């Protein structure tokens, strides 16, 4: 996910992994790593149509084009969608300006027409995530895949009232609650993954820097922000795996819609 604005929520969070001017190296690697995984996972299935919900800047939808016949990116931010249309002009990539709180997704994307729905870091921003999950399931074909991520409650912190410190977060999820949400909408989790390596490396780098054992971080090296090196770092250090999933900031799942 690149934009929370698909649900007209507060806390818009735009990250472009290929923006060399953004110094958030590890965060960029994690964002890109999730899309690299989604494309790699889907490619052998040769999906006809993939929907990237809350596509934001559109770089993830572009990545998914390498695995799918067609990709549709969905976001409520009209300016973002227009920018993405101008930036990524490909015959099999389309962008839809859609606020899911204001209407049903199936009005623009046919019921049971989508091979896979991808939606990263979205559900935690919604007051009614079940409504979104129901819409995702509605447009999915039987046997279609749902690939999503949410922050792990173990990685979140609350204020003195017990509410999320990140005010754009309306929900806390653990694996059990996310699995229930998916199952209640006709899908079954088949894989749980995480990105613990990147988080561990980021923390280690911070510790060494604070202790003055190192004078520079990877994010201080301009060469690391090139497109080629961002992809390399995302694959090497931030590619979702099934190892040490509780050490990951985000819970990442692959679910499959039940056959009729």
Task: Enumerate the language-model features and the residues they cover.
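Conserved N-terminal segment of class I S-adenosyl-L-methionine
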Residues: 1-112, 116, 120, 130-133, ...
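A short His-aromatic
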Residues: 121-125
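Conserved catalytic-core motifs of eukaryotic protein kinase domains, centered on the activation segment
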Residues: 128-129, 159
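A short glycine-rich, Lys/Arg-flanked "PGG" loop and its adjoining helix->strand segment in the class I
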Residues: 130-142
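Short, glycine-/aromatic-enriched active-site segment of Class I SAM-dependent methyltransferases
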Residues: 148-171, 180
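Residue-level marker for beta-strand->alpha-helix junctions and adjacent short loops that shape enzyme
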Residues: 153, 197-199
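Short aromatic-enriched loop/helix-cap "lid" or pocket-rim segments at secondary-structure transitions
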Residues: 158-162, 201-207
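A SAM-dependent methyltransferase catalytic signature shared across enzymes that methylate proteins
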Residues: 178-195
